[in-house]
Amino acid sequence: MDFSLFYFANNDTEQQDCYRLLLEGARFADDHGFTAVWTPERHFHAFGGLYPNPAVTGAAVAAVTKRVAVRAGSVVAPLHHPIRIAEEWSVVDNLSNGRAGVAIASGWHAADFALRPENYETRKSALIDTIDTIRRLWRRESVELVDGAGESVSLTVFPPPVQPELPVWLTTGGSPATFELAGRHGLGVLTHLLGQEVGTLAQRIAKYRAAYQEHQGDGGRAHVALMLHTFVGTDREAVRETVREPFSRYLASSFDLIVKAAEAAGADGAAMTRELKNVSEEDRRFLVAQAFDRYFETSGMFGTVEECMAMLKQLADAGVDEVACLVDFGVATDQVVDGFQHLARLHDTWRAHTGR
């Protein structure tokens, strides 16, 4: 099972050097045998707001690394023309000498679609066609479009990428249908434990691999990457107290984002909006505290190396191929960087234990 770093910052504090953790983490990952660095696409909210364009942050990661894969986790494809996605990531592929990869998401927050409002209703149904177009462009195939004069033109993107095929994952919060869709189309899966338990994840991975084998045979490589909130230390209770307050802020920020998403959904989200807005501050604190306890105990990788090894064993048994360690959930940058030494020891211990 591979290790990578994942970023999805809750930018709730003013920092002049707000990308220091990204760049120091990228160098750490490159030097310590990690597989990849993932950065997301988020818009119009402090939750993830450092990352409006993963191709830009990916280019920065490419510039300070030599070996580690540079990935989007994820590109919200309906917000962009497929040609722009192929062009931007071909640049990243060239800057990194063939290390680019992208997870593709359909998007969910209506406010994000202020960028491409015409794509909101078809964001899910058109996703596979968009991925197919990106893959064709990556292979140097031409696509037919209409230019500004109303004429049909055949276009090929530049610069030519280094890799003959673009590694692509399909992002899902746990939908069984999306797991199977990824398998049918020969895509990897990027997922998380925010709405699913490890046992449920194992069942979905099994269905994904079955669909992959049925439709792709032995000609491809099924791959499941799991985003996992991570902080490793030398004492479990010390880790708990280190992450409690920042991670609780992170969860509260996520709660606010859900409220805004419900508001943006208009009539469809009216009932949820009323319910969420009627939650008292005391009840909100209770919900956040409960969520923290659940994530800490069952849905994150927190604690000592020995304790985190047990979580890794569960994930490997579930069929996870790569643990994408989410490290930027509000803990002070210096503390996260100091904790990298323990994460490196976890990585090395796992490799020694499994032989790979």
Question: What is each PLM-predicted segment?
Answer:
Residues M1-D17, P78-A149, G188-L190, L194-A202, ...:
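Flexible, glycine-rich active-site loops centered on histidine and acidic residues
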Residues M1-V64, A69, P164-L166, Q341-H342, ...:
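N-terminal beta1-alpha1-beta2 module of alpha/beta enzyme domains
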Residues F3-Y7, V37-T39, V70-A72, A100-I104, ...:
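Hydrophobic faces of well-ordered beta-strands that scaffold small-molecule active sites
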Residues Y7-Y19, V75-I83, Q163-G174, T230-G233, ...:
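Active-site mouth loops of central-metabolism enzymes
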Residues Q16-F28, E88, T172-E180, V305-Q314:
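Short, acidic/polar
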Residues A29, G33, E41, V61, ...:
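Conserved, mostly hydrophobic/aromatic
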Residues A36-T57, V61, V76, W108, ...:
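Glycine-rich, proline-tolerant flexible connector loops at the mouths of alpha/beta enzymes
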Residues E121-V157, G199-V320, R351-T354:
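An alpha-helical appendage that flanks or caps ligand/catalytic pockets
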